[in-house]
Curated annotation (Swiss-Prot):
Family: Belongs to the cytochrome b family. PetD subfamily.
Transmembrane parts of this sequence: 36-56, 95-115, 131-151
This protein's record includes keyword Transport: yes
Keywords, alphabetical: Electron transport, Membrane, Photosynthesis, Thylakoid, Transmembrane, Transmembrane helix, Transport
Protein name (record): Cytochrome b6-f complex subunit 4
GO MF entries: electron transporter, transferring electrons within cytochrome b6/f complex of photosystem II activity; electron transporter, transferring electrons within the cyclic electron transport pathway of photosynthesis activity; ubiquinol-cytochrome-c reductase activity
Location in or out of the cell: Cellular thylakoid membrane
Bilayer topology term: Multi-pass membrane protein
GO (cellular component) term, any one: plasma membrane-derived thylakoid membrane
Organism: Prochlorococcus marinus subsp. pastoris (strain CCMP1986 / NIES-2087 / MED4)
Amino acid sequence: MSTLKKPDLSDPKLRAKLAKGMGHNYYGEPAWPNDLLYIFPVVILGTIACVVGLAVLDPAMLGDKANPFATPLEILPEWYLYPVFQILRVVPNKLLGIALQTLIPLGLMILPFIENVNKFSNPFRRPVAMSVFLFGTFLTIYLGIGACLPIDKSLTLGLF
């Protein structure tokens, strides 16, 4: 079976369309020169116009000027490092905090050996893997929210 759709030139309807200059989409349109010379530049120029238009209409506001002599009260990392930052901030021993972070990949590597299931089975019928995934997701969200709060409210999220 061919990956290209070849036209049936014995079809009289197709031959009539081709005689009129129509029907080229019936069997596929060539990439050269149609796409490369006409469609791609329109998309590229349209993208550039959108970016320039957004930059002109809604420029990003600058924040406060940096002052090297005044350090903020708490320096937060980027948002994707909040859970790791919270673990290191809450655990009293920093070596223990690093050890806790190495247990996460080790636990994920051990998980397939704990639950011996066919790789084609339904993932919703794998209770150990699903419970570990859901627990890890909720714990990550909990730690991420706690990292944004002051340290005295970070474990309870200020609820009690």
